[in-house]
Amino acid sequence: MTPGRRTLGYESFDEVMPDVERLLQGHTQVGNWTLAQICRHLGAILRRHVYLPASTTFDPSDRVCEDQKRRMLETGILPEGIDAPPGAMPEATLSEAEKAEGLRAAIAYFRASPGPVTDHRILPLTRDEWDRFELIHLAHHQSFAVPTAAD
């Protein structure tokens, strides 16, 4: 685990934006991405999982086996160093507040959807498993930003 990274887990989408708002008050970056880049990436992935056509093909060698999927869903830990899909890598210079609002909108969009329709490296997933996966993914990236403001 990257030194300085915080232990973080979300049980509900309702926990995500209060954490982001706390980070906007002050934080230390311990990974490679800024808070704006993290928010941009997370928003893009949430939207991608809802609207990417189900007919999109993926490399079968990129699949996660059932044991890895089960372990990730049980532990809530997503390994570091997994490559992001094309189009989900954030630009270098972004506005934190703007991208935080984009993440808020993407979370609402995802929650209002009937469920992700995309093929994915960890398929098949139930809707509850998809929600769990997204919460794990959100916490994974947000854990690289450590709040400096007192609660």
Locations of the language-model features?
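Extreme N-terminal tail/first-helix region
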Residues: 1-21
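Short, helix-capping/interhelical loops that line the mouth of catalytic, cofactor-
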Residues: 1-5, 50-116
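Pocket-edge positions in alpha/beta enzyme catalytic cores
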Residues: 5-8, 30, 95, 122
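Amphipathic, well-ordered alpha-helical segments in soluble domains
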Residues: 12-19, 41, 45, 102, ...
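Hydrophobic packing residues in well-ordered alpha-helices of helical domains and bundles
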Residues: 13, 35, 96-103, 131-134
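General secondary-structure edge motif
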Residues: 18-19, 83, 121-122
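Short, contiguous alpha-helical
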Residues: 24-73, 112-151
